[in-house]
Regions:
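Conserved micro-motifs of the catalytic ATP-binding
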Residues: 85-91, 127-130
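Short conserved segment of the HATPase_c
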Residues: 178-190
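Short helix-loop "hinge" at the ATP-lid/N-box region of the Bergerat-fold HATPase_c
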Residues: 146-147
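Short beta-strand/loop element within the Bergerat-fold HATPase_c
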Residues: 154-165
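Conserved catalytic submotifs in the C-terminal HATPase_c
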Residues: 92-95, 114-126, 162
Length: 236
């Protein structure tokens, strides 16, 4: 009897997983379809803004900013949906020198960091396996965000080895910090209604999903109170 119940339960679980996967695929196709329909309209608006530039530069500039924001939002929604639908497909790994890699990433971020802010890197010349492209993407996003909200003080990128197969990349700043009421939904998409020209709020959810596909996690260190600290922990 117990065995029969187990088999029946297992069948139900498999059916539920299959339905969930089908729903995800349908959602992805729906979003891609909507986005592809939006693209011609956005391209037309962008062209109109260029034509308007000579006659009314201020209005044209605003229009260009709004069109660019909508295009980015469309791209981000597509990527978010694609990531959600492929979480079990991990990225390919390759070897990097942590110290050299972190220095290069910080060099790319420096153009966004204010002159009153000191950038620093603390990472050893150690070989680790990871997906270089996706790791750089997450860290650059975090560093750029830190640059936006840090007027003075320091922005740092640090590497810590937590075990034979676990390591962390830590981005810390002395900026304004994140209000407590926003911290709970930080990695959840569509939890905040905001002006798209200031950002669509999908950057951290996308980074979190990329981290999951790297066999890791992206978290906010809520115990740090002198600014903001994000911890990207990876398992290899």
């Amino acid at each position: 009897v117990i065995l029969l119940k187990f088999i029946a339960g297992n069948r139900k679980l498999k059916k539920s997983v299959k339905i969930a996967n089908e729903h995800n695929e349908l959602k992805t196709k729906f979003i891609q379809n909507i986005s592809s329909q939006m693209e011609p309209t956005l391209n037309t608006l962008a062209h109109s803004a260029e034509e308007l530039l000579q006659k009314a530069p201020q209005e044209a500039g605003q229009m260009q900013g709004q069109v660019a924001a909508l295009k980015k939002f469309s791209d981000d929604i597509q990527e978010l949906s694609s990531l959600e639908n492929s979480l079990t497909e991990f990225y390919e790994l390759g070897e990097i020198n942590v110290g050299t890699f972190c220095e290069n990433v910080m060099d790319k971020a420096k153009e966004y960091i204010k002159t009153e802010v000191t950038p620093s890197v603390n990472a050893p010349k150690l070989q680790v396996k990871t997906n270089k492209e996706q790791l750089e993407r997450i860290l650059l996003y975090l560093l750029r965000n830190a640059a936006i909200y840090t007027e003075q003080g320091r922005i740092s990128l640090e590497f810590k080895k937590r075990g034979a197969h676990t390591h962390q990349f830590i981005v810390t700043d002395t900026g304004t910090g994140i209000p407590a009421e926003q911290q709970e939904n930080l990695f959840k998409p569509f939890t905040e209604v905001k002006d798209l020209t200031t950002g669509d709020g999908l950057g951290l959810p996308i980074c979190s999903l990329i981290a999951a596909k790297m066999n890791g996690s992206l978290t906010l260190d809520t115990g740090y109170t002198k600014g903001t600290r994000f911890i990207l922990e990876l398992h290899v």
